[in-house]
Amino acid sequence: MRIAAIINARAGTVLRMSPSAVTERLSVVWGSLGHDAAIILAEGKDMGRMVRKACRDPDIRAIIIGGGDGSLSRALEHVLASGKSLGVLPLGTMNYMARQIGMPLDLAQAAVALAGAVQTPMDVGRVNDRYFLIRACFGAFPEFIQSRDRVRRKGGSFLEGALAGLSGVARRYRIVEAELSSPGGRARIATSFLMISNNLCRDSDPFLLERERMDGGSLGVYVGRSAGPVGLMELGLQAAMGRWASNEALFQGEMHWLEVQTEQRKPLISIDGEVEKMEGPFRFDILPGALSILVPK
C-alpha cells in the first residue's frame, strides 16, 4: 500500500531524535513490511500544503500525520474531503488521540502498528468550519496552554511547562460569560471552564482525557460549576487525576449540537491543544463516522 507520512519537523520527538533519524527509522520499518511510503518533513504552513498535495494524489491510500494532536486536527479538512484514511504517528506532547485508539507511543512500534492497522469509522467534531478530534475549550484552559507551550518551546520540561501554565492562568484569570443554545433549550453561564468534546469523556489515568467511545454520535459538554478561582482549582485537580465523568466540579451534558454566544467577540479558544482567537458565535456539531482512521489490531 502506498502511504504518505507528513511529519511535523517541530514535533518534540523529531527534535529529540533529529529529523534524519526519524525518517530513516520509518523508512526501514515500512520498507521491511512491503509498504511504499513517501516521508515528508514540514513545518508551519508547509504542513497544510503537503497534506493537501498528498490528499490529491490518487495513488496514495492513507495519510499518516506525525506530530501532536494539533497537527492531526489541522489535517482533518483535507483528509475528510479526500475520503482517504488517516493514520496517527504520535510525536507530540500528550498524544491524546494516539492513546485513545491504542497506538504505541514508541516510534518504531507505532510504525509497525500502522502497517497492519484496520480502517475504522470515527466521529469528528466541528465548530463553525473547523474540525476537531478531541475537544474545544474556552476560559482558563487556553490560557494554560499558551503559557505552558511558551516554556516547552524553549526546552522546558513537562513539569516546568505545567507550572508556567498555572502561573499564566493566575495572572490572566478569565471568566466566560455566554449564552448556550441546545436541543434542550437555552441557558446563560458565567464560568472559568467550558469544554466541548468529541463524544463523552470517561475517567482515565492522571493527566489524560479519554472518551467512552469514538462512534457514539454525540458531543460531550462540560461547564465548570464555579466562576471563582477556588472552584477552578478543584476542577483542575480532579481533571489532573483523570476524573471527567465523576468530576463533581463540572456540569455535564450530551447533545448533538450546541451554539455558544460569548460576550467577547473573539475569545481565546483551544482546539485539540492549539490556541487561537476565533470570532463567534460558535456552532458545534458532530459528524458521525465521518473519518476513516487507522486503528491498531
Swiss-Prot record:
- Name its cellular compartments: Cytoplasm
DAGKc domain mapped to chain residues: 43-131
Q: What is its EC number?
A: 2.7.-.-
- Record has Cytoplasm as a keyword: yes
The biological processes this protein is annotated with in GO are:
phospholipid biosynthetic process
Phenotype reported upon loss of the gene: Normal magnetic response, normal magnetosomes. Deletion of approximately 80 kb of DNA, including this operon, leads to cells that are non-magnetic, lack internal membrane systems, grow poorly, have reduced mobility and take-up and accumulate iron poorly.
- Name the residues that bind ATP: 68-74
Keywords from the named record: ATP-binding, Cytoplasm, Kinase, Lipid biosynthesis, Lipid metabolism, Nucleotide-binding, Phospholipid biosynthesis, Phospholipid metabolism, Transferase
Q: Which GO terms describe its molecular function?
A: ATP binding; kinase activity
Q: What is its main location?
A: cytoplasm
Reply yes or no: does the keyword Repeat apply.
no
Remarks, miscellaneous: This bacteria makes up to 60 cubo-octahedral magnetosomes of about 45 nm in diameter which contain membrane-bound crystals of magnetite (Fe(3)O(4)). Expression of just the minimal mamAB gene cluster (MGMSRv2__2365 to MGMSRv2__2381), including this gene, is sufficient to form a minimal magnetosome chain with small magnetite particles.
From the Swiss-Prot or TrEMBL record, give the protein name.
Putative lipid kinase MamU
Native organism is Magnetospirillum gryphiswaldense (strain DSM 6361 / JCM 21280 / NBRC 15271 / MSR-1)
> Gene behind this chain?
mamU
